[in-house]
């Protein structure tokens, strides 16, 4: 699923503008006082999301249930490389191959295809596209902070 995605919920069908909507399975829910950590497996990729306990309860999130990792393109950062970085606090590091580069007037869109076939797209300033070597065919890492990854359910 990509961009303007139709989703069904108790509130009815809605469409969202988030560029990245990845279907997976919840592998763990860590309960906290105010926030919790939800782990979701999307293809071969393990992702984590820090969301409020209220959201965990409202969505009735449980281990083993299907869910969506929702990431706005503006929340995706990029780095050069073919291995996750070990000196970075962001938990979600998705290694892939650059498959699309679309420069705009000041910033552009870059898409990576992951080993499992999932695609993640992010926004990046044009000068950084060149500086990071984000060219079709090159390896890169899409980085998303756990606080920037939303969870959705049907």
Regions found by a protein language model. Give the residues of each.
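Glycine/charge-rich catalytic "coupling/switch" loops of P-loop NTPases
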Residues: 2-23, 28, 46, 53-108, ...
């Amino acid at each position: 699923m990509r961009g303007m995605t139709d989703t069904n919920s108790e509130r009815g069908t809605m469409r969202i503008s988030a560029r990245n909507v990845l279907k997976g399975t919840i592998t763990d829910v860590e309960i906290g006082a105010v926030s919790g950590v939800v782990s979701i497996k999307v293809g071969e990729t393990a992702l984590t999301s820090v969301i409020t306990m209220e959201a965990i309860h409202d969505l009735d999130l449980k281990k083993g249930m299907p869910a969506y990792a929702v990431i706005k393109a503006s929340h995706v950062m990029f780095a050069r490389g073919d291995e996750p970085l070990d000196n970075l606090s962001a938990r979600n590091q998705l290694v892939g191959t650059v498959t699309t580069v679309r420069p705009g007037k000041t910033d552009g869109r870059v898409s990576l295809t992951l080993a499992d076939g999932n695609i993640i797209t992010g926004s990046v300033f044009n000068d950084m596209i060149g500086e990071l070597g984000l060219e079709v065919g090159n390896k890169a890492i899409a980085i998303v902070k756990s606080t920037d990854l939303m969870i959705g359910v049907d």
